[in-house]
Amino acid sequence: YFCHNANSVRNILYLERNGKGYNVSLQVLDAILCHNGEMLSKKYEPDRKKTKEQFLQEYHDCWHKENASLELKPMTLEGCVVRISDVISYIGKDIEDAMSVGILQKKDLPENVVKVLGDNNKSIMNKLIGDLMIHSYQKPYLRFSHEVFEALSTLLSFLGEKVHHHPVLEKENAKLSRMVKELFDVYLEELEN
């Protein structure tokens, strides 16, 4: 299986600097591995007892078990920040991108989401970051208010249905997949000959 987050760890450890990799801490590697924001949680609490061996097993599982990265839990609060930042950074941008290509219009957004989060990237990011800061301040975890979590959850479901699985995008993704496979086959053949 390919997980972009595990591939990022691989790049840092084995590919960067002409194959020498970088010397980074276990906590940094763990935050990178856990940054995948596809699983929304109301509360992000670190697994402070996670060991190097557990990290290595999680890294291995990302390559060998389907959806393994969805179950990852960062070992530090900073890693939790990285994980939720992934969602915060792309949710509003996905809306603006979908609007710019004509898949979505502002009037299509769920009314309860717009009321709580707003209808553009800037307002959504401001609301999510502000709410997270208010409800996480001086706590050993990160969390959203119930209202913001519900709005964000609704928005993610809406985008999944109306944007990420839109027929036009599905068709284009199928084309891209075929093109990448063809390129891979051509380059593999060149390497073998």
Segments (PLM) and residue ranges:
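Active-site-proximal cofactor/substrate-binding loop regions of enzyme domains
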Residues: 1
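Histidine-centered, transition-metal-coordinating active-site segments
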Residues: 5-6, 11-19, 23-193
